[in-house]
Amino acid sequence: MAEFFDALNDDHIAFIAKQPMFFVATAAADGRINLSPKGYDAFRVLGPNRVAYLDLGGSGNETHAHLVADGRITLMFNNFANPALIMRLYGSGKPVLPQDDGWEELAAHFDILPGTRQIFDITIDSIQTSCGWGVPQMDMKAERETLVKYHRQADPEAWVAKSAGRVKSIDGLPTRATDRYFGGQ
């Protein structure tokens, strides 16, 4: 059965640390809801009501646009092994770019990966745990290295050109992204 909490406790933090992936959901007042899976060693608990995750450049930038427009975010962790458990973190967040105040403080918590474009700084309002009994059991095989390898080998100028269309969401919402933000001068 579902339980709600006002802050992360030690058991929650230990559960999060064991999960190899998590899911991020955001939406603006109008338009599409975005739901994205995330991997890598990219999530950090910064306090009982504060978390952050490192974001790499990819196919879109929906989370950024939605957080600028609305601020709401839900993160979900799921144990695909035993014991079954689902944990949702409800809150608000903001994108922090390399040129922003606060970048250095947040970046110090991570090994910055090639292609890092921002860190999402999230304040948690509530936490919900539920049984997860309807979720299948699966084993972790390995992290996919494709995205990091791509960014290691990418030509910065080509990346800037390719990323120019990612300064808006698929619904046309603006982000704070710039050519400099994507690695240009």
Which residue stretches match the model-derived regions?
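Binding-site signature for planar aromatic cofactors or substrates
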Residues: M1-Q185
